[in-house]
Structure formats: C-alpha cells, structure tokens
Amino acid sequence: MIVLNVTYQCRPGMRDRFLEQITAEGIDAASRGEKGNIRYDYYLPIVENDDLLLVEKWQDADALTEHGHQPHYVRLKEIKAEYVTETIIERFETGE
C-alpha cells in the first residue's frame, strides 16, 4: 500500500476557495472512485490557516500511476496553479 500526505500551501486566504472548487468539481469523489483507491480525504490543519492536507492511500504503484493520468487529476493541477504556492508530498509504503 502507498500512503501520500500531500500538503498544499495556499495563497493567503485562498484555502477554503481551493477546497470548495475541488469538491464542487467532484475531483475528490472521482479520485475515491478510482480502482485501487483506499482513501482520499482532505483535512484542515488547526495551526496553519493557509494549508490543506490531503491523505491518500492506494493499493499499489500501478493504481497511483493510473490516478495521475485521470482527467480530474489534470484538472486539479490546473486549479492548483490558481490557489497553491507550494505542494509538499510525503510518500510512505507499507507491506499491507
């Protein structure tokens, strides 16, 4: 299993708009519906007002690679350009 902790550092005051657009366009739901997806959830950190945390779990590397080719993933990259200044990705692999 592959786990990604993705921290989006948003432009000041833009985090809520970023998350609203993701959900309005169904990007989160589409990702959850992909083959091999186990978890795809957004969290709002209490301390960092402009950060948005995404926790993803994928069955294997093939599922994660396929995710990167989906139209909703491409759309997320376009949305990020408007709202996000930096993306930090932590990747973990487990034997599960």
Spans of features found by a protein language model:
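Glycine-rich beta-strand-turn "strand-cap" elements at beta-sheet edges
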Residues: 39-50, 75-96
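Residue-level signal for well-ordered alpha-helical positions
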Residues: 21, 43, 67-70, 79
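Acidic-residue sensor for enzyme active/binding pockets
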Residues: 34, 56, 90
